Amino acid sequence: MVDLTIEKTKYPRAFVVGSPIHHSKSPRIHNFWLKQYGLQGEYLAQEVTSEKFNHFITSFKKIGFCGGNVTLPHKQEAFRLADYKDKTATIIGAANTLWYEGDKLCATNSDTYGFSANLDDFASDWGGETALVFGAGGAARAILYALKERGFEQIYLVNRTKQRADNLAQHFGKNIKVYDWHKIHEILYQADLIVNTTSIGIKNPEEKSDSFFCDFHKAKKTALVTDIVYTPLITPFLQQAKSCGLKTVDGLGMLLHQAVIGFERWFGVRPQVTKALRTAILEDMSEERE
């Protein structure tokens, strides 16, 4: 439970808020940067349920927070509560980064930047004409926006619940076509980029054989495959792609890069996503599995 009696400090203090929150890597990322750059500051995880989220958001400035990150299940509510939403948050319809400008609560969504920056790191020439995206949840919104900004002319959207995909395609307008989950083999060969935003096969590795199997042998040999899930680092989706000789990018970098936007705003330094940071987070993940 969030402690609304936290004392104010002379240095910046930021948060990540969600429920559950114990699994969040954000405190490790931000505190790594604070130490690296020799900055006075603090970044704390705050467990806040949906019933208490509104109160937390309207109170955090009074108890010494300058802003923070928002994770599940609060991103859409954070967007609704903000006085100012930038273009990215407005298009996505959800916010994961908050700060104050005067008395106005401001919001953006850094997932779009995080997704693109991660691919820039590992495949700087990523792009093309056609992309294939699996999933139609909140993360898919951020990625569809990133792909449209990158200039993809055709984006195929596939989701087990077709109506959700239809709604998302309608929200983003032209160039997005919804395709049947069980007919992906008909379009797989066209994709220059293949993105998974679902948790298929993560909790149950055998799930892919019953509900979904992507035959990457039918994909372009030059196709790039990425999964936004980073636990495990190499998901079943990426394993399938690797086994067919395709280049893959894991989802950890998206998490690291999306944190840059908030850190710069709260602490005044634009941090770098380095191998040292990635190694530190991977070590934490390894310890959690033991």
UniProtKB/Swiss-Prot annotation:
Residues given in the record as shikimate binding sites: 24-26, 71, 96, 111, 230
Superkingdom, taxonomy of origin: Bacteria
EC numbers on record: 1.1.1.25
GO molecular function, a single term: NADP binding
Coiled coil: none
Pathway: Metabolic intermediate biosynthesis; chorismate biosynthesis; chorismate from D-erythrose 4-phosphate and phosphoenolpyruvate: step 4/7
Record family assignment: Belongs to the shikimate dehydrogenase family.
The protein's name: Shikimate dehydrogenase (NADP(+))
